[in-house]
Swiss-Prot record:
Gene: moaA
UniProt: [4Fe-4S] cluster 1 binding residues: 15, 19, 22
Residues given in the record as S-adenosyl-L-methionine binding sites: 21, 64, 115, 189
Family: Belongs to the radical SAM superfamily. MoaA family.
GO molecular function: 4 iron, 4 sulfur cluster binding; cyclic pyranopterin monophosphate synthase activity; GTP 3',8'-cyclase activity; GTP binding; metal ion binding; S-adenosyl-L-methionine binding
Swiss-Prot/TrEMBL catalytic activity: GTP + AH2 + S-adenosyl-L-methionine = (8S)-3',8-cyclo-7,8-dihydroguanosine 5'-triphosphate + 5'-deoxyadenosine + L-methionine + A + H(+)
Protein name, entry field: GTP 3',8-cyclase
Keywords linked to the UniProt accession: 4Fe-4S, GTP-binding, Iron, Iron-sulfur, Lyase, Metal-binding, Molybdenum cofactor biosynthesis, Nucleotide-binding, S-adenosyl-L-methionine
Function text: Catalyzes the cyclization of GTP to (8S)-3',8-cyclo-7,8-dihydroguanosine 5'-triphosphate.
Length: 329
């Protein structure tokens, strides 16, 4: 297994979209109160006194939608300036990004991943559950703003859902032709969305690659921070294509990350919520950071076994108790 040096930090469980694969229609969510979320100070304490001393060097801010987090820019600036932080990135839906892109860039945010599941405004609005208001144009303006201020690499994440947006794979791949953009196709997976998954299932990454290969050809490539993605490019294109194949091609041996939820639960494996640790309660009950660090180190030492032997036993009930929006993706 790779060294675990990457922490995904959910800043908030709320989102201004309600994407069907992330927050299913039937989901009844109880959002966290502000007091139930980790504060900026608590996040910084955990990074500075627990995770960085344990070798974590790369951090990604997620949600929900992280741009909804109050005092976001000062938090980004504080994390970016912590000794030991080598890379700070964010995943966002870009709806509020146009007005924040420059400030985030100036604060020290290195990279952005942006969810863009369709280039068709009607399909896009259907996927995000727009509730009567079209949001495609403002999202696209956010992506353009991120490009203008200099975020590089700029990655676009596409969750491919059969019969919904899979017919756009070639159009989305074409975005990489004349831009230094990196489009990543993600296999749809069943976490908190069993009904939609059972209705739609998923398309293997290799099938998507075959479609692209048949039109333009494909060659292997590299991009910074590729994580579990397999990277290719269309010959002559400026950008790249990534394929995240968590359903068809197990990549547990390449896993280098843990996840911290907005309410302080540390999750060593996306597919396993039975092995979580409540760091917020430890902090708020006065447990010294050195003891929290020792507990996290013990969980870190168990991660290979959790990944390989327990990924199919990731819940105690057979169903995940949290949606992707609550986990932080």
């Amino acid at each position: 297994m790779n060294p675990v040096d990457y922490l995904r930090i959910s800043l908030i469980d709320r989102c201004n979209f309600r994407c069907h694969y992330c927050v299913p229609d039937e989901a009844s969510l109880q959002y966290l109160l502000t007091s139930e979320q980790l504060s900026n100070g608590e996040i910084l304490t955990l990074l500075e006194q627990v995770f960085i001393p344990l070798g974590f060097r790369k951090f990604r801010l997620t949600g929900g939608e992280p741009l909804l987090r109050p005092q976001l820019v000062p938090l980004v600036r504080a994390i970016a300036h912590l000794p030991g932080v080598e890379d700070l990135s964010m995943t966002t839906n870009a709806y509020l990004l146009a007005d924040l892109a420059q400030d985030l860039y100036n604060a020290g945010l290195n990279r952005l991943n942006i969810s863009l599941d369709s280039l068709n405004p009607e399909t896009f609005d259907q996927i995000i559950g727009n509730r009567g208001k079209s949001r495609w144009q403002q999202t696209w303006e956010g992506i353009q703003a991120a490009h203008r201020v200099g975020f590089d690499p700029l990655k676009l994440n596409v969750v491919v859902i059969p019969g919904v947006n899979d017919q756009e794979v070639l159009d989305l791949a074409a975005l990489t032709g004349d831009r230094h953009w990196h489009v990543r196709f993600i296999e749809f997976m069943p976490i908190g969305n069993d009904k939609l998954f059972n209705e739609r299932a998923w398309i293997p990454s290799e099938e998507l690659r075959q479609r692209i290969r048949a039109k333009w050809g494909l060659e292997t490539a590299f991009v910074q921070g590729n994580g579990p993605a397999d990277i290719f490019k269309i010959p002559g294109a400026k950008g790249t294509l990534g394929f995240i194949s968590q359903m068809s091609e197990c990549f547990c041996d390449r896993c280098n990350r843990m996840r911290l939820s907005a309410d302080g639960w540390l999750r060593p494996c996306l597919l396993n919520e039975a092995a979580q640790m409540d760091l917020k309660t430890l902090l708020r009950t006065g447990v010294p950071p050195r003891e929290i660090r020792a507990a996290v180190k013990a969980l870190l030492d168990q991660k290979p076994e959790i990944n390989f032997k327990m990924r199919d036993m990731g819940t105690t009930t057979g169903q995940y108790g949290r949606t992707m929006s609550q986990i932080g993706g």
